[in-house]
Amino acid sequence: MASSSRTALPSAVLALRLLTLALLAASLAVIAADKLTLDFGGGLPPKKITFKDVYAYRYVLAIAVIGCAYTLLQIPFVAVSIAKRKRMIGGSENVALFLIFADVIFALLVATGAGAGFGLTYDAKSAFGGSKLPGEVVRFFNMAYAAAGLMLLAAAAMALIIMLSIYSLVR
């Protein structure tokens, strides 16, 4: 009984890390797949727009990649804590504090990615006519909203990880 309660917090953190990884990977896939082709007619060639053409969407993609890499680096720490039946991730207070500080930095970074995606998408959609936009343009913006939303959920999962880590540190 004591060993299962001892690994309950690290197990919850592992589940949240895996959820964070899945959300960031989904955000990465959605923003990378977001494409738009505008046909202006009149003999002009169609213009293809992807995340590469919009700085904020490139930022969303970059943060998703960085967040995935960071989460993949953190998963072994949690797995070792579970395997050793340690309540505190990292083994010592100093390592746990360092990991919490790193989590805070990356949670804020992921939140800025979500904010950049939401902000630009809202402004661009409003500037180009909002509800009067053609269906393909609306789909382009909605996919960007989806990527930013997934990233925001990942930031929330990281915030929960931080709370659980702090709780295990002070407990």
Curated annotation (Swiss-Prot):
Family: Belongs to the Casparian strip membrane proteins (CASP) family.
Location, primary (coarse class): membrane
Species of the source: Oryza sativa subsp. japonica
InterPro entries per the UniProt record, alphabetical: CASP_dom
Designated name of the protein: CASP-like protein 4D1
Parts of the chain that traverse the membrane: 12-32, 60-80, 95-115, 146-166
Membrane topology: Multi-pass membrane protein
Cellular component, GO annotation: plasma membrane
Extracellular side: 33-59, 116-145
